[in-house]
Amino acid sequence: MKKKMLCPIVIVIAFLICCIVYFKPLSLSDVAEADNQMKMIYSQFEVENGEAYIDSVNYQDITIDQKNAILSLLDKYTYRRTVGTLFSNGSTSDLGNKTLSIYVYDDDLLINSVFATSSGKVVINEKTYNMEDAERFIEQMIEIMN
């Protein structure tokens, strides 16, 4: 009788451990290293006089000081997998009014891409995740670049 009860209990415990590991916070600092090159595009969606427009700024030439500040900021933020992350294709519908695209290169090879939205969604290498304080993250990144 005890063996019959032990097997389902072990399965439930193993499932709970897998859930904890799967949903644990992941660090944004894993997407870039000091020897990588970075490029960014910041976009803000607005409506003026009834017409929608997108204001975009490209940040192509990132200085060493800016890169160090960016790496430090990336170390402070985390993101989490969702149930849908496993099956996501990198698309997201809830963008908010601000987005930041970060492209990380090793020489000329794109190794990581991050698309953060002010709504709390972040797409990393074509997988969608949730990120707390995403809007603050975007604003701090823009402060570093300006």
Residue spans of the language-model regions?
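Function-determining sites in protein domains
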Residues: 4-146
